[in-house]
Structure formats: C-alpha cells, structure tokens
Amino acid sequence: MAWPRFLQRGALLTSFSHHHLAVFLLTFFSYSLLHASRKTFSNVKVSISKQWTPNAFNTSLDLPAEIWSSNHLFPSTEEATLFLGTLDTVFLFSYAVGLFISGIIGDRLNLRWVLSFGMCSSAFVVFVFGTLTEWLHFYNKWFYCGLWIVNGLLQSTGWPCVVAVMGNWFGKAGRGVVFGLWSACASVGNILGAFLASSVLQYGYEYAFLVTASVQFAGGIIIFFGLLVSPEEIGLPSIGAEESSEEDSQRPLIDGAENEDDYEPNYSIQEDRAVVQVKAISFHQACCLPGVIPYSLAYACLKLVNYSFFFWLPFYLSNNFGWKEAEADKLSIWYDVGGIIGGTLLGFISDVLQKRAPVLALSLFLAVWSLVGYSRSPNNKSINALLMTITGFFIGGPSNMVSSAISADLGRQELIQGNSEALATVTGIVDGTGSIGAAVGQYLVSLIQDNLGWMWVFYFFILMTSCTILFILPLIVREVFSLVQRRQAHSLNE
C-alpha cells in the first residue's frame, strides 16, 4: 500500500504556517476551557451533595432537626445524587438543542463572535451557579435547573464553531492526524478542570467554579481579539481553492467517489458531480448528506458512554471504592489520557488506510472488552488507572474521531464542494444528536445505579457500544470491501 502523499517528505508540516499554529492553539484551548468548566461540576458532586443534605447530627448545639435542615435541598444523599443526574440530563438536552441552533448560526454569522460570546456568557452563568449561590447561601432546585439550561445553550456554541474554524484552515490531507491530535482539547480540558477543582476544593466547591469561570471568561476575550476564522481574512486562498488546484489531491476519507475506473464507491458519496452552492445549506439539506444520519445515530450511543465516564467517573471511584474525592478527581485523568492517545493514533491509522469506518469498528469492538475488564477492576489504584486508560483509548479515541475528523469530512465532502457554509451545521447535527443520546443516558445511569448497582451500568455501556457498531455497519461493509478491492488491484499491478 502506497503511503498517502501528506506523509511523504514532511509534506504535511511544510504546508502549515504560523497562522495555522495560532488557529490550532486558540481553538484547542478555547474548547479546553469550556470542557474544564463542565468537568468542575462532575468533580465536585460529592461536595455539592454534602452541602445540599443535612448533617446527621451536630454536637455544638441541640436544636430541632428542621432547623438544621432548613437551608438544605434534600433529606438524603440519594435524592441529592438523583438531582445531580437530573442536572446532567437537563444540561445535555439544552446543549443538544443548542448545537443544532449554533451550527446554523455559526454558518451565517462570524464564528469568532459566536464563540467568544458563548465562552464569556457561559463563564458568567457558571460563576452564578456554583459560586454566587453559595456565597449568598441561596439554594433552589428550579433556579439551578434554569441556570444549567442556559449554560447548556451557551456552551453549545463552542464545538460547531471550533470545528468549522479548523475545517477552514486544515484540508483533507492528514486530517485524521491533525484533528485526532486537536480533538484532545476535550480531554485536556477535563484534565485541566480536574486539576483546578482538586487544587482549591479544600477551600470549598464554590472556589472551584470561581477559578474555572474566571479562566474561561479570559479565554473568551482572547478569542474575540485574536482568532482568524478563515485564511481569506488575511488574503490567503481558502482550503477548497488550494485542494482543487492540486492535480493529485487526495480523495475525501468519507467520500467513496473513486476515479471513474476505480473501485467500489464508498457509502458516503453516491454522486459523481459536485454541486457548487453559494449560500449556507439548510438544516434539511445537511441531514440528507450521505453519512450524516448513520454517524449521528452512532454518535448518540457512543457519546452516551463517553459522557457517562465524563460525568460519573469521579463519583463512581468515590462511591464504589471509598476513595477521597480529590484522589478520585486526579485518578479520573487517566481516562482522558487514553482518549488523547486513542484519538491521535486512530486518526493516523485512518489517514494511512484512507478510510475511517473500519478503524472505528475495530476500536469499538475492543472497547466492549475493555469495558468488561474495567467493570471488574479491583480496589487498587494502579490497576484501575491502567484499565481506565485502556478504556479511554477505545471509547474516548473513537468519540474524538467522530466528533472532529469525521464531522469535518462530512461537512466538506465533494457533494457540496465549493460551499464552505456547511461545516458548522453538519457538526452541530452530529454532535447535537450525540448529546441527545448522552442526555438520556445520564438520567438512565443514575436510575440503573440506584436500583441495580454499578455492574448493570457497565452492562448498559456495553449494549450502547455495540449499538454504535450496528449503526455504521453499512459504512463498515462498503469501506472494507473497497479496501479489499484496492488491495487486489494493487497486487495485480505489481
């Protein structure tokens, strides 16, 4: 098999300028900060739960129970835990709805404005939710739900915008490697959020929210003044213009349209002619693009599992093994480390094969067995961290790949070549559908855990991972068949 052109003689690195590096870093850290603020909430759940429930007794004063309970939301830790799961669900549902809207807005307004507004506004809401309410000793379930709905809508501006900006600057050559490495932004944000939360948690959970909100607000200001959303802003040719000018430009990895006398076409592109559009495509048109619906449904199942680890892993470690909250926060970082390595390595392999679905399928198959192994992890931090890293590799890696490289492929496939106003919409559809699945999943996780225990939660994860494979099965079959035909043709030519 011949190596892709971008891997030969360092062609990929030489095609990048300092503008590409600046865009890579700014979008990377902007989404990292958004994820850090989300991670803060999951990392302080135990502290919040204690604050929202009354103490069993108080030896300093002998007062009636109603006095001690007057400033608390719930009579028991179990009810507080269930409400925390409800908040996760509320956030993800509003986040999912916001993704569909933000994708459309991002394709019609300046991406820099939308991203900066979302970051700064979300930071303010997080400050009010976690810090101001605690300083004022104001506890109200409906107020918390309302704030978290608004936060979900504001946070949804992030992913479609950053993926669209990256798609404007980085072409299909080496997209798996570049986006695989870049998609580690979510995992880096999780690590950053865990470290920030654990470092100030001893002073009170409100300071964890204060620190992450402040850093995120500052990041939004930097994005507003420093981000270039496309090469055209500084007089450089667009990615589409550069790629169309190359005589032997690479075939899109989601695109199965081969040369006319070549092999079986991929599932994702079924027309030979590119339709050139000028205006932003509609939501319905984006949904009808080949490959969008299968990957969206698959991502609904996969993101459910990935976000369950994101929201519940520190709580699981504290609840199931009795480890201290700060220790559980730091240990949960290893899941994100596995996701970073997995996303980058899987992206590289998919670039070499020039196909995404087979790589995704193999990783998800191994993810099932990694979930089985992690569910039986002993009460040993070293072994748990190792199994957690492996699980993150096979769950977080494919999740990063679908939400970044594959979404970019879908939004820039040949069927809509010449239209740069589709990427944010397509990304919003894929990630929005995934977030709906994740939203339903978070509430189910809390119910399953409360009634059946943690082992049944892992059985549920295994089922959802298997469903992910089923939804993209037609793409897997077509792309594997295409690879076999290519291999046979290569052997005949030799």
Swiss-Prot record:
A GO molecular-function annotation: xenobiotic transmembrane transporter activity
CDD domains recorded: MFS_SLC37A3
Protein's name in the database: Sugar phosphate exchanger 3
Gene Ontology CC: endoplasmic reticulum membrane; lysosomal membrane
Species this chain originates from: Mus musculus
Complexes and interactors: Interacts with ATRAID; the interaction is direct and both proteins are mutually dependent for their stability.
Description of post-translational modifications: Glycosylated.
Main location: endoplasmic reticulum
Keywords (A to Z) from UniProt: Endoplasmic reticulum, Glycoprotein, Lysosome, Membrane, Sugar transport, Transmembrane, Transmembrane helix, Transport
TM segment ranges: 10-30, 81-101, 113-133, 146-166, 177-197, 209-229, 297-317, 333-353, 357-377, 386-406, 428-448, 457-477
Domain of life: Eukaryota
Residues listed as glycosylation sites in the UniProt record: 58
Cell compartment(s), UniProt: Endoplasmic reticulum membrane; Lysosome membrane
Protein family (similarity comment): Belongs to the major facilitator superfamily. Organophosphate:Pi antiporter (OPA) (TC 2.A.1.4) family.
Region spans: Disordered: 240-261
GO biological process: xenobiotic transmembrane transport
Record membrane topology: Multi-pass membrane protein
Disulfide bonds: none
Pfam family, one: MFS_1
InterPro entries in alphabetical order: MFS, MFS_dom, MFS_trans_sf, Sugar_P_transporter
Annotated function: Unlike the other SLC37 members, lacks glucose-6-phosphate antiporter activity. In osteoclasts, forms a transporter complex with ATRAID for nitrogen-containing-bisphophonates (N-BPs) required for releasing N-BP molecules that have trafficked to lysosomes through fluid-phase endocytosis into the cytosol.
Lineage per the UniProt record: Eukaryota, Metazoa, Chordata, Craniata, Vertebrata
